[in-house]
Amino acid sequence: MTTSALKKRIDNIREKGGIKSREVAQLLDTTPQTVSRWQTGQASPQPKSLERLLTLEWLADQLSQFYEPDEARLWLFSPHALLSGSRPADLIATGRTDEILRLIDQLQSGAYT
């Protein structure tokens, strides 16, 4: 993936998800310095980090259909009963995105709107 494409994806996550740079790093289980190096082309994400980055971008896109950026950020960092009290951010950071994706599918179907 090119530097400009990677930067665009990270910017999209930050913009649509209302997520700060350090939170992007937290969600991807890396450091803010590493994310900065990805954005400037000084480094490339490992496959696992790239997969999480792409999933996080997809999630931010989906949440933007329902929420403003500040609301999406709140959704990501708040405990949810439908996730057994877990925060989506914690599940993303540990690679357990399947549960979140199922919840997003339910939101899209109108089950919890």
Roles of regions detected by a PLM:
Residues 1-113:
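Non-transmembrane "mature" sequence context
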